[in-house]
């Protein structure tokens, strides 16, 4: 027999959403820092070609 599921509380919903948003913010921050270091050619994990055509 099918039983309806319990409803998720607002606090749990907010907690999950804020956790997801914080994870997204940290990934965006890391991406921007990497982009800045690449644009300034200070990144050590990338090889740059110095030959211009």
Swiss-Prot record:
Disulphide linkage map: none
Superkingdom of the source species: Eukaryota
Region feature (Disordered): 1-21
Pfam families membership: Ribosomal_L32p (PF01783)
GO molecular function: structural constituent of ribosome
InterPro entries: Ribosomal_bL32, Ribosomal_zn-bd
Residue intervals passing through the bilayer: none
One GO location term (cellular component): chloroplast
Gene3D superfamilies: Single helix bin
GO annotation (BP), single: translation
Keywords: Chloroplast, Plastid, Ribonucleoprotein, Ribosomal protein
Protein location: Plastid, Chloroplast
UniProt-listed HAMAP family: Ribosomal_bL32
UniProt family annotation: Belongs to the bacterial ribosomal protein bL32 family.
NCBIfam families referenced in this protein's UniProt entry, alphabetically: rpmF_bact
Name used for this protein in its record: Large ribosomal subunit protein bL32c
Organism: Cyanidium caldarium (Red alga)
Taxonomy of the source species: Eukaryota, Rhodophyta, Bangiophyceae, Cyanidiales, Cyanidiaceae
